[in-house]
Amino acid sequence: MPKSIIVPAGTHKPIAPFSPGTLADGIVYVSGTLPFDKNNDVVHVGDAGAQTRHVLETIKSVIETAGGTMEDVTMNHIFVTDWANYQAVNAVYAEYFPGDKPARYCILCGLVKPDALVEIATVAHIGKK
């Protein structure tokens, strides 16, 4: 099964050995996405809603670069550092998935940088385009 590496224009260089996304058999796998700028610094420190929006916009750019849309998302893996931010994360998340909701789970955990409040990894089925 051949795969394609998906790297949207302007994407920051990952801080570890991974690609922002891969496409194989019409499925886009988006790596865990953190609220980082192009220098791998955390953006919107202390604002879980703004960090969630930044993360989802980054995920959207990976999926669109692969030829899909957010409507193609079938699964999200969400990681948060504090349950107090859960409502803010969900409020922004709902804006990106207004219709049929993809499957998901949410885990409370520490993240790679202390100021990062949310990380999301995504799977989207875009078909053979």
Swiss-Prot record:
Enzyme nomenclature, EC number: 3.5.-.-
GO CC annotations, alphabetized: cytosol
Pfam families: Ribonuc_L-PSP (PF01042)
NCBIfam families: RutC
Free-text function comment from the UniProt entry: Involved in pyrimidine catabolism. Catalyzes the deamination of 3-aminoacrylate to malonic semialdehyde, a reaction that can also occur spontaneously. RutC may facilitate the reaction and modulate the metabolic fitness, rather than catalyzing essential functions.
Family: Belongs to the RutC family.
Name of protein: 3-aminoacrylate deaminase RutC
Organism: Rhizobium rhizogenes (strain K84 / ATCC BAA-868)
